[in-house]
Amino acid sequence: MLEERIMPIKRELIEYATLVENMVEKVIKGLMEKEKSYPLEVIEKDEPRTDRYELELDEKCVWILAQFQPMAVDLRTILMMLEMNRDLERIGDLSSTMSRSAIFLIERPQVKPYIDIPRMSDIVQSMIRDSVNAFIENDSQLAREVFQRDKTVNALRDQIIRELLTFMSSDPTTIERSFDLISLALDLERIGDHSTNICEDVVFMVEGEVIKHMDDKNKDKDRK
């Protein structure tokens, strides 16, 4: 009976994750193709959908908690779905913020070729997808692999910031555009962090190990 209530929520979480992953993709597609319609669609159509998902999923999870008072594994599953719902909502919010930066940049000459931003986006999209897959499949090993990708995202963020600081110091006319590019990189990095939040919960649910606040070396170690 309880499993029959949980499975539809899992399916909705997959749909929700696909939506926010596509939002990230649209923002970067618009930036690369200099086409404002993509980020505008994220703001005008997709963001309201994420808000509806977040509210509906929250209500369903709270209803299950109240009606069934689940214990042990079922309780951890419901609590994790609530946490995942909030992480996906934040990813949607960050995608909308990125859309505004992208529109600003589309309307102006490029500071530099966009190479690392789309690379970051591709990795972050895979992190969103695999974090949810790890939850659905109870795959803690996949969750730990996502931690490794987060290191790459952080390195790309740092590289982008270093390059743009150089541009700004040599040509002050690039400052405003450079700041928006830095904002994009920081938002992508935060989206990666929300994906790792989900993976931390997966590891706890599957292995019973709390890895929040651990350093990266301990997070991605193999279980003995």
Predicted features and spans:
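Cytosolic, long alpha-helical scaffolding segments
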Residues: 1-224
